[in-house]
Every structure is written in structure tokens, then in C-alpha cells.
Swiss-Prot record:
This is Large ribosomal subunit protein uL23. One of its GO terms (cellular component) is ribosome. InterPro entries: Nucleotide-bd_a/b_plait_sf, Ribosomal_uL23-like, Ribosomal_uL23/eL15/eS24_sf. The lineage of its organism: Bacteria, Pseudomonadati, Pseudomonadota, Betaproteobacteria, Burkholderiales. It comes from Polynucleobacter necessarius subsp. necessarius (strain STIR1). One of the early assembly proteins it binds 23S rRNA. One of the proteins that surrounds the polypeptide exit tunnel on the outside of the ribosome. Forms the main docking site for trigger factor binding to the ribosome. Gene3D superfamilies: 3.30.70.330. Part of the 50S ribosomal subunit. Contacts protein L29, and trigger factor when it is bound to the ribosome. Keywords: Ribonucleoprotein, Ribosomal protein, RNA-binding, rRNA-binding. GO terms for molecular function: rRNA binding; structural constituent of ribosome. The gene is rplW. PANTHER family: 60S RIBOSOMAL PROTEIN L23A. SUPFAM superfamilies: Ribosomal proteins S24e, L23 and L15e.
């Protein structure tokens, strides 16, 4: 029983947050997908289990994109932003995740 709780605790660290952008909104409307920023060591099955656990929905498929950090300059110092990983989660028909705040 403690093994299940430990696994659930690890799944809570997989999803870092939703991606709110023009492209993510367009994909959500057109393809009924939701875009999440995920941990760099997460894989497709981890993301699927985490979404099903947190949002109580059924996931159809997951596509993952590794995004390299952009090179940036800070004055005379050169650096780059951190690499990120995004997951495009396709939900089964009839399933929906809403990120809008509800007023009581």
C-alpha cells in the first residue's frame, strides 16, 4: 500500500503546469488537446498516469516535445534559457479539462 502512495507522490511532480499560449489555445480548440509543461525526466506513460490521477479524465494519447533553450545575452555575458519539455495530451471523446477559475 505504501508503494502505491509513493508512486502517486512521484506522479504529482510530473506536471509542472499548463502552457497558456496562442498555439496551445489553437491546438486545444482544433484538436481537443491540452498542453502541459512537464518534468525533463518524464515519459509518455508518466504524463498519462499523472493527468488521469489529477484531473480524473481518460487520456487517449500523449505526444512529447523537447524544446531547446534559446541563447541569450545579458550585457557582455552569454548564456541560454533552460531546456524544457512539453506534453500534448489528447483526451478521449467527451472528456474535458478546464483551467478557468470559477467564482462562488
Amino acid at each position: 500500500m505504501s508503494q502505491v502512495r509513493k508512486n502517486d507522490h512521484n506522479l504529482m511532480k510530473v506536471l509542472l503546469g499548463p502552457v497558456i499560449s496562442e498555439k496551445a489555445t489553437m491546438v486545444a480548440e482544433k484538436n481537443e488537446q491540452v498542453v502541459f509543461q512537464v518534468a525533463r525526466d518524464a515519459n509518455k506513460s508518466d504524463v498519462k498516469q499523472a493527468v488521469e490521477l489529477l484531473f480524473k479524465v481518460q487520456v487517449d494519447s500523449v505526444q512529447i516535445v523537447n524544446q531547446k533553450g534559446k541563447p541569450k545575452r545579458y550585457g557582455r555575458f552569454e548564456g541560454r534559457r533552460d531546456h524544457t519539455k512539453k506534453a500534448y495530451v489528447n483526451l478521449k471523446p467527451g472528456q474535458e479539462i478546464s483551467f478557468e477559475a470559477e467564482a462562488n
